[in-house]
Amino acid sequence: MNKKEERASLIYHSKPKPGKIAVVPTKSYNSQRDLALAYSPGVAVPCKEIEKEENNVYKYTNKGNLVAVISNGTAVLGLGDIGPNASKPVMEGKGLLFKIFADIDVFDLSLIHI
């Protein structure tokens, strides 16, 4: 990659907002009622329904359309052992591909060894 394309890549990953993926609400949050339904006390109702019938988790949550992309950064896409923080752009890129090609939501996790 030439210097011009390297610079373009850095700008792409940092502007206007750093990263390539985000968590966005799927429900309204414009009122106190919306927030009460989204969290407490309203969230208890679907929790109880899931407790009664475990498969309800797919009815009331995003579980059926959510994956985790996890790396500790030790074997990254031809880059080798670059560490968890340096692997984050690759994990976000995988998340972006899942979203645009399959409409699957992703949480990317970069794990640090302790």
Predicted features, each with a name:
Residues K17-K59:
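An N-cap/entry alpha-helix motif that binds or orients negatively charged groups
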Residues N30-S31, S71-G80, F98-D108:
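Gly-rich Lys/Arg/Thr-decorated short loops/hinges at beta-loop-alpha junctions or inter-strand turns
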Residues K15, V57-K63, I70, K99-I100:
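Solvent-exposed alpha-helices and their adjacent loops that cap or buttress functional pockets
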Residues Q32, A44-C47, G64-V67, G73, ...:
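A common structural microfeature
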Residues L77-M91:
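Glycine- and acidic-residue-enriched helix-capping/strand-helix junction motifs
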Residues N2-K3, H13-K20, P25-S28, V90, ...:
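Extended, charged alpha/beta regions that create polyanion-binding interfaces
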Residues I112-I114:
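Conserved small/polar residues in nucleotide/adenosyl-binding loops
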